[in-house]
Structure formats: C-alpha cells, structure tokens
C-alpha cells in the first residue's frame, strides 16, 4: 500500500475556510498528501475582513507539534500565520529538535491583519 506523504501545516484557523489551516489542508489533500495541522491562532474572519484573532498558548502549540512529529513524522512543514513571538520561539525550538527535511515559510504575521474591523478594536 502506498503511503501518502505527511505534510504538517502550522498556521492560524480561518473559520470561513478561505485561508490558514483550512486552505492548507485542502491544498495538501488535493496534491495527494496527508495533512496534519497545528493551530497557532483562531481567527474570526470572512470575505469581508478579519474581526478578531486569539493566539493559542505556546505550550499547546508545542504539544501539538510534538504529538504530530513523534507519531506521523512529516516529510515537510509549512508555516503560515504566527501571531505571537513566544509561539515563534516555540516553533523554532521544535524545528531544532526534530530537524524536518523540508520547511516552507509563508509568513502571515498579525501586523498584516491591521485592518481588523473598527467595532472589534473598540471592544
């Protein structure tokens, strides 16, 4: 039986499905890979904009990475939205520990989400 290559996506979650982990899973699957995921942040967004961003605790991010790396052993890691410097440090620590064969860095930082809607910024 042929094993599909495991690709790990480390990124934010987009509830509308148009970006982040959801888009990565669709793309990896369409290309014949097996998608594993690590959520770095949860966003409230749609086609009209980003309304809120909540980072995941760094220890949860570390736990997710370790769970996937220890079991599934991905051949590649794709890194997208990283919303917090502590999460960046956590990811770097894990990359040093596991030394994946391929890393794709597709940076989406919170600063690029500066157009968070006015009502959300006031609350």
Model-derived features: where do they sit?
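Short, well-ordered, mixed-charge alpha-helical segments that flank or form enzyme active sites
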Residues: 86, 111-114
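A short helix->loop->beta-strand "cap" motif at the edges of active sites that frequently abuts
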Residues: 98-103
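Single conserved hydrophobic/aromatic residue that forms the stacking wall/gate
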Residues: 115-123
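Active-site beta-loop-alpha junctions enriched in small/polar residues
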Residues: 82, 108-110
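N-terminal glycine-rich "phosphate-gripper" loop used for MgATP/nucleotide binding
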Residues: 75-88
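Small-residue (G/A/S/T)-rich helix-start motifs and N-terminal tracts that mark the onset
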Residues: 1-76
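Generic enzyme active-site microenvironment
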Residues: 76, 104-105
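Alpha-helical scaffolding segments of alpha/beta enzyme cores, especially the outer helices
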Residues: 63, 67, 86-93, 97
């Amino acid at each position: 039986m042929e094993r599909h290559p495991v690709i790990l996506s480390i990124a934010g979650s987009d509830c509308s499905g148009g970006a982040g982990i959801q888009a990565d899973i669709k793309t990896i699957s369409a290309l014949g890979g097996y998608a594993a995921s690590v959520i770095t942040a949860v966003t409230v967004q749609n086609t009209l904009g980003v309304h809120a961003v909540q980072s995941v605790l760094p220890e949860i991010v570390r736990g997710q990475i370790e769970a996937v790396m220890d079991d599934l052993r991905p051949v590649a890691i794709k890194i997208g939205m990283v919303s917090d410097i502590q999460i960046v440090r956590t990811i770097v620590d894990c990359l040093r520990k596991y030394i994946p064969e391929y890393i794709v860095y597709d940076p989406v930082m919170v600063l690029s989400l500066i157009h968070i809607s006015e009502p959300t910024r006031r609350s």
